[in-house]
């Protein structure tokens, strides 16, 4: 039997409700929940002595249960004569102080300020089926009538699904009238006779009528889920309504995840109740291929502090791999946020236990213990060393984190894209001990002083290149003539884009004959590299604070510069383009021609290309080919990055085998006794799949 409206128009029609109640007969239809779900809130705001006006009562048992609980001065109205007759017959003897009247809620016959409380459960929703002018006028009449009959200090309790247009009308009307507005979320949904649930949560809005005071801010509050929690106050109706919509979105996610496995990763943020800043990010990953047993339905994985940018945790593909490897049907991967304090794993588990159960998969056995997993024995470490703001990239942080194997790293992260590490360096901590020298002159000998330990000095491991594309760019130097002699040759290198300086420093330190010039547009980046990444300039290392486009065009116009190597490692600030490295202007033909003009005839132009748009990538390659006749490409494993090695002539073509052999010879020269080398870095390996394009 279909008891729910077939369309929103039926939802508001009196004829529908007449038919509806005839079909229901004596049984109560508890629209949006019954007394058990609502009683806690109702008795919080409605006192036994209050005179209560119930709008659109229907044949709900709510008024009867309120009466039996002590709130006996109840006046109920409804537009349906059928339901009012039924309710009067049912209650006239048992509940003599409660009245039921046929009346239109938009034009009642009650005196002004005669009620201390007004209760509406779904009537406003039923009226506001759309945003037509007539509908909005009817809603305004209803709310104005409620305001008229309610005494100052009285409360209007509105139980609603808070659809967007209803929410807008309700909040705007009462906040603009100077009323205090508070909202509670009651439940996930109301269970129907078939066992299905509403996909949207139910809210109780509590509007308190107060005397308007000029200049007094409107009070807009959302109550937390847990008992005893402090209300969250919002500064504007827009913020308040967005908070309600966030609850609705979360409820829809819960509903979907509780009933089905998700074929796609679902992510959401949990915010701190006081600061409203993100405290946790959840990534919910289902692995349908996992064979279910009693104990592998559900688990939580905590990413150690500071490691959320690693591929395994920071990419969807990596998280999918992680979920498959741990062997649970559903895995919630939890990222911790900077600027939030976490005590230990036990405290995190206690904080999240209730929330993660809301996102449990279907079929989770009752009382099953949910395991909390991690990549280490503790929650990791993150120390913010410096904060700043760049004119070009916005706010940024420099932070030290402990990675896998207790290695420590320093990272530059722009907060506009927190999942991407702009620069990273491996740290080498050292300490210096200052002891007292022994004196032969006993008369002058002072009392012994304990050895003093200076504060730990942080040193950068300049052999470490964190980015795989940086390693590939260095490997591309094997394309130069006589790579075995290259480290000592006076090669001239132009690098566009500084970052933390690791790429430029590597060239400077491992190619002692080189002369490196770096062009960086952002002074803040140079400051960070110099102050926090041990970058320094000397006679072989010079930084130009300039726009790379302008600088290269100027060099080409002057016709004096000639470089053996030109490297582009510069990102785009325009997210609307399907290419994040480099900016489109850097691959225009006229500009590339200037790059060609300042490149040695036997030199190499190395471009870090990050392009997700296949058509745009093809276009870039076509333009490059118009300027550079020979181009090698090396894809970076598990990344979008592609390194292009562009030669100004095609007289000498290397096979993949020849290039790898050339890279091996170059690496032999770079691995000098007494010079630190990253054992994980193989130049030849970085060119394993290079090909001419």
UniProtKB/Swiss-Prot annotation:
Q: What is its EC number?
A: 2.1.1.-
**By its UniProt entry, which SUPFAM superfamilies does this protein fall under?**
S-adenosyl-L-methionine-dependent methyltransferases
Q: Which InterPro entries match?
A: Lys/N-term_MeTrsfase_sf, Methyltranfer_dom, SAM-dependent_MTases_sf
Gene Ontology biological-process entries: methylation
* Top EC category: transferase
Its catalytic activity? L-lysyl-[protein] + S-adenosyl-L-methionine = N(6)-methyl-L-lysyl-[protein] + S-adenosyl-L-homocysteine + H(+); N(6)-methyl-L-lysyl-[protein] + S-adenosyl-L-methionine = N(6),N(6)-dimethyl-L-lysyl-[protein] + S-adenosyl-L-homocysteine + H(+); N-terminal glycyl-L-lysyl-L-glutamyl-[protein] + 3 S-adenosyl-L-methionine = N-terminal N,N,N-trimethyl-glycyl-L-lysyl-L-glutamyl-[protein] + 3 S-adenosyl-L-homocysteine + 3 H(+)
Keyword set, alphabetical order: Methyltransferase, Multifunctional enzyme, Transferase
Q: Which GO terms describe its molecular function?
A: protein-lysine N-methyltransferase activity
The family line of this record is: Belongs to the methyltransferase superfamily.
Q: Which NCBIfam families match?
A: MFS_SpdSyn
What's this chain's function? Dual methyltransferase that catalyzes methylation of elongation factor 1-alpha (eef1a1 and eef1a2) at two different positions, and is therefore involved in the regulation of mRNA translation. Via its C-terminus, methylates the N-terminus of eef1a1 and eef1a2. Via its N-terminus dimethylates lysine residues of eef1a1 and eef1a2.
Question: Which named protein is this?
Answer: eEF1A lysine and N-terminal methyltransferase
* Organism annotation: Xenopus laevis
Gene (name only): mettl13
């Amino acid at each position: 039997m279909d008891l729910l409206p077939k369309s929103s128009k039926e939802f508001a029609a009196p004829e529908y409700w007449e038919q509806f109640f005839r079909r229901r007969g004596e049984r109560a239809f508890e629209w949006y929940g019954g007394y058990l779900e609502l009683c806690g809130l109702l008795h919080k705001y409605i006192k036994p002595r209050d005179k209560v006006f119930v709008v659109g009562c229907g044949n709900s048992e709510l008024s009867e249960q309120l009466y039996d609980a002590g709130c006996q001065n109840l006046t109920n109205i409804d537009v349906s004569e059928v339901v009012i007759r039924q309710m009067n017959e049912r209650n006239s003897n048992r509940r003599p102080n409660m009245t039921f009247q046929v009346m239109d809620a938009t034009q009642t016959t009650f005196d002004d300020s005669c009620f201390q409380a007004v209760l509406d459960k779904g009537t406003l929703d039923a009226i506001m089926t759309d945003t037509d002018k007539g509908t909005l006028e009817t809603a305004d009449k209803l709310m104005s009538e409620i305001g008229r009959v309610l005494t100052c200090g009285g409360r209007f309790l509105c139980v609603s699904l808070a659809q967007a247009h209803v929410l807008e009308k309700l909040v705007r009307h009462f906040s603009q009238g100077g009323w205090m507005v508070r909202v509670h979320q009651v439940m996930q949904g109301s269970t129907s006779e078939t066992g299905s649930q509403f996909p949207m949560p139910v809210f109780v809005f509590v509007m308190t009528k107060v005397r308007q005071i000029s200049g007094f801010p409107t009070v807009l509050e959302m109550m937390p889920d847990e008992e005893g929690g402090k209300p969250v106050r919002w500064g504007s109706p827009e913020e308040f309504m967005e908070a309600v919509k966030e609850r609705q979105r979360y409820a829809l996610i819960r509903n979907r995840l509780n009933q089905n496995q998700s074929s796609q990763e679902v992510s959401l943020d949990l915010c701190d109740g006081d600061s409203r800043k993100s405290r946790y990010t959840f990534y919910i990953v289902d692995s349908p291929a996992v064979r279910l047993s009693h104990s592998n339905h559900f688990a939580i994985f905590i990413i150690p502090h500071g490691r959320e940018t690693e591929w395994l945790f920071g990419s969807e593909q990596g998280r999918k791999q992680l979920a498959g490897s741990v062997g649970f049907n559903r895995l919630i991967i939890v990222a911790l946020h900077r600027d939030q304090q976490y005590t230990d794993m036990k405290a995190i588990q206690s904080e999240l236990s209730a929330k993660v159960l809301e996102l449990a998969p279907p079929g989770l056995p009752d009382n099953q213990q949910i395991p909390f997993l991690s990549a280490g024995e503790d929650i990791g470490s993150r120390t913010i060393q410096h904060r700043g703001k760049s004119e070009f990239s916005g706010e940024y942080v420099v932070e030290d984190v402990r990675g896998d194997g207790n290695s420590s790293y320093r990272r530059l992260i722009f907060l506009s894209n927190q999942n991407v590490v702009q620069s990273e360096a491996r740290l080498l901590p050292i300490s210096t001990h200052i002891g007292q020298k022994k004196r032969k002159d006993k008369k002058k000998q002072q009392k012994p002083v304990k050895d003093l330990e200076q504060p730990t000095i942080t040193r950068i491991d300049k052999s470490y290149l964190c980015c795989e594309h940086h390693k590939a760019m260095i490997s591309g130097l094997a394309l130069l003539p006589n790579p075995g002699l290259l480290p000592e040759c006076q090669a001239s290198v132009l690098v566009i884009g500084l970052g933390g300086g690791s790429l430029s420093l590597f060239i400077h330190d491992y190619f002692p004959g080189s002369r490196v010039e770096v062009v960086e547009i952002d002074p803040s980046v140079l400051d960070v590299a110099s102050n926090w990444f041990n970058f320094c300039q000397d006679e072989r290392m010079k930084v130009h604070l300039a726009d790379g486009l302008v600088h290269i065009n100027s060099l080409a116009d002057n016709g004096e510069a000639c470089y053996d190597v030109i490297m582009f490692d510069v990102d785009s600030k325009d997210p609307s383009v399907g290419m994040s490295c480099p900016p489109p202007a850097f691959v225009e033909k006229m500009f590339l021609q200037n790059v060609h003009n300042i490149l040695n005839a036997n030199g190499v132009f190395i471009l870090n290309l990050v392009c997700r748009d296949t058509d745009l990538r093809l276009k870039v390659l076509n333009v490059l080919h118009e300027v550079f006749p020979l181009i090698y490409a090396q894809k970076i494993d598990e990344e979008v990055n592609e390194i292009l090695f562009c030669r100004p002539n095609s007289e000498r073509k290397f096979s993949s085998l020849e290039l790898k052999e050339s890279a091996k010879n170059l690496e032999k020269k770079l691995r000098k006794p007494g010079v630190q080398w990253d054992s994980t870095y193989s130049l030849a390996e970085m060119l394993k799949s290079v090909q001419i394009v």
